[in-house]
Amino acid sequence: MPIAIKNSKIDITSEKRTKELAKKFTKYLKGGEFVFLYGEMGVGKTTFVKYLINEYQKINNLTQTEITSPTFSLLNEYQVKDIRIKHYDLFRINSKEDINNLDIFEKDNKLITLIEWPHLIVDKQDIKFITLTFNYLNQLNDRTVDIKV
């Protein structure tokens, strides 16, 4: 992962900066990764995912589709050429058993798994994961994301 992203705190106050970060992130994710997205409601997790998936569509000459939060469906899935992207939102999940029933930890080198609200996931062994923690600063005016690889 480029040094500008790995284990760093990045300003994403504007949507433009969020989009730029998502674009950089696509150069790192090749398949087989799990990305955990932490942060309060409305801080930019789904916006980041939208720009990330749209960038994959763009670089593969595909029509950019509307990317929405899977808060109610729990999962939205996208096929981008030979890469599948699963976008989970676990906000409404209340137990570890419910997480186990979702079969989130499918291991596939052609799959990128993005998980919002991963707080109940405790058994992270045997998976390669990246943590993005989105934060508000200055009474919600500014935002940052901390990236841990």
Language-model-derived ranges and their functions:
Residues 2-24:
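N-terminal pre-Walker A segment at the start of P-loop NTPase domains
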Residues 35-37:
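Hydrophobic anchor at the beta1->P-loop junction of P-loop NTPases
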Residues 54-66, 80:
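Post-Walker A helix-loop "phosphate-sensing" segment adjacent to the P-loop in P-loop NTPases
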Residues 40:
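P-loop (Walker A) phosphate-binding loop of NTP-binding proteins
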Residues 95-99, 105-149:
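Short phosphate-coordinating micro-motif centered on Lys-Gly-acidic
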